Amino acid sequence: MDQEHLNPEALNFPFPAIIGVDEAKKALLAALVSDDIRTVLIQGGTGSAKTTLIRSLTGISEREVLNLPLGTNDDQVFGIIDLEETLLTGERRMMPGILQKSDLNILHADDVNLMDHSLLDQLLESVNRQKALVEREGLSYEYRCRTTFIGTMN
């Protein structure tokens, strides 16, 4: 059976069945239930079930897990103001980035230590403020981002 026909739920290992990562599990559970915990960093060696653990969160939470690929740029993360539509309609229109799409969900970045540091700083600031600001061509757009950011690294 090829990948496109696999049930995405079948790819997720059950959260309770993952063993040997108790501290990481406690941190993730705390982040799921607390509005005050907005970021979690999990460090572990290759093959230590970091990504499996993050994916398993969909089985114990209503929240989706969105992945932030390494090499993603500012516009892909924060979104862009659709200047053409804004000029045509007179209303600011936003083309959302992954941060806006992750509102009320979980945003996961693997190898977070390899991310562009400036982008990571802006991302963490937005997550902690629960608001993101996009400024382009003299226009600005602010949106809520009540996301939980989880970074993993070796």
Regions found by a protein language model. Give the residues of each.
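AAA+/P-loop NTPase substrate/partner-engagement loops
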Residues: 60-86
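P-loop NTPase nucleotide-binding module
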Residues: 30-34, 122-130
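Walker A/P-loop
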Residues: 32-70
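Conserved Walker
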Residues: 37, 43-45, 87-98, 112, ...
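Conserved AAA+/SF3 P-loop NTPase catalytic/coupling segment centered on the Walker-B
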Residues: 44, 53, 73-74, 100-127
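Conserved alpha-helical scaffold flanking the Walker A/P-loop in AAA+ ATPase domains
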Residues: 29-32, 86-107
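Structural recognition of the conserved hydrophobic beta-strand(s) that form the central parallel beta-sheet
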Residues: 108-109, 134-135, 147-154
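Pre-Walker A (pre-P-loop) alpha-helix and adjacent loop at the N terminus of AAA/AAA+ ATPase modules
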Residues: 9-43
